Amino acid sequence: MRIQNITDMIGNTPLVRVNDKVKYYAKIEGSNLFGSVKDRAARYLMENAYNDGIIKNDTVIIESSSGNFGIALAGMCKIKGNSFICVVDPNITEVNRKIIELLGAEIIIASKTDENGNYVQDRIQIVRDYITEHENVYWTNQYENQYVWKAYFSLGEELCNELEQIDYVFVAVSTCGTLAGASWKIKEQFPDCKIIAVDIAGSQIFERSKKKKHISGIGTGFVPQNLTHAKYDDYMIINEMDAVSECNNLLSKGIVVGASSGA
């Protein structure tokens, strides 16, 4: 396959059957350019924000992310030539930190936790303070930016084109952007499809748990505005150890995933 633009390596990911007994499929979003479903949002956001005149070549981009969206934005900013500041947790994985830095981003580390041990509120406050104190800075705000959740229309459309019938879709949630965008397109074509949001124990999105969350990439410490756009039927809370166990199960099938996919 010949690629004219490197960002064309985002989207149109493989759909793999992972269970012989039932028709159970996994969308392999790790095959995207920077390795995750968040590549869709980073690309869509940057391209549309440029087209709409919201950001220019000299605009500094800032975001709160210790994971895949930070990596994806760092990559897109590298391609576009924008400076990028990524506000992260102190417990960010060494691999993620090195990738973000390798792609040219500046990293700011949060230090204050909320009552449940989460750093997300401090990360967001750091971003708010920065954009107040500096000019020509754009906060991509993955928790409520319409560019983020609308980016996942493409994911929903791909699933609808690849499958003749969809009965259930399970979507891991954090910013709830993937859930919102994909659910819109799936419900358009398959209105009877049950869409299930999958959260992790210790997250605050659906239940006010006082349990500390240890796994990154799924769940968060508040209810993102993106959730208001989601067309989901139910949610389920997954134990962290069960998520890890399912990662190992998928690994036995040759599919390497993180905890959000395991959940």
Question: Where does each model-flagged region fall?
Answer:
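PLP-dependent amino-acid enzyme catalytic core
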Residues: 1-263
